[in-house]
Amino acid sequence: MESRHAIREAAFQALFALATNPEADKDAVYAEVLPQDTEVPAYLTTLVEGVLSKQADLDAALTPQLKKGWTLSRLTKPDLIILRLGLYEIRYEEAMPEAAAINEAINLAKRYSDDQSAKFVNGILANFIQATPQA
């Protein structure tokens, strides 16, 4: 598993499994989402550990991007995980271009949710970038 796209997809699957069962062993989850006898890629652990450790910050940054009256708890679990993963890459993975992070998040939404979710994810992440002052 060498492509960043495949690693990102495995990260989504791992984060979804851990959100569903927070007591799950991460190594067991990685074994489930990776092809058999595959070493855990460093970027996979970076994404999963990063999203989990920064979850409160990510959620705080996502909340203002929602429509008035909406909360994160109203989102579907896949959409929320995709948004967290995309925002993590935008905020903390400096080598990742913002547009590429959004595109990858859209692709995950199309695969694991639907076209409406893909548009929603695009809008939320694009709004975040637009609302964030550039350095």
UniProtKB/Swiss-Prot annotation:
GO annotations of cellular component type: cytosol
Molecular function GO terms recorded: RNA binding
Alphabetic keyword roster: RNA-binding, Transcription, Transcription antitermination, Transcription regulation
One BP annotation, GO: transcription antitermination
InterPro entries for this protein: NusB-like_sf, NusB_fam, NusB_RsmB_TIM44
Functional note: Involved in transcription antitermination. Required for transcription of ribosomal RNA (rRNA) genes. Binds specifically to the boxA antiterminator sequence of the ribosomal RNA (rrn) operons.
Similarity comment: family membership: Belongs to the NusB family.
Protein name, as recorded: Transcription antitermination protein NusB
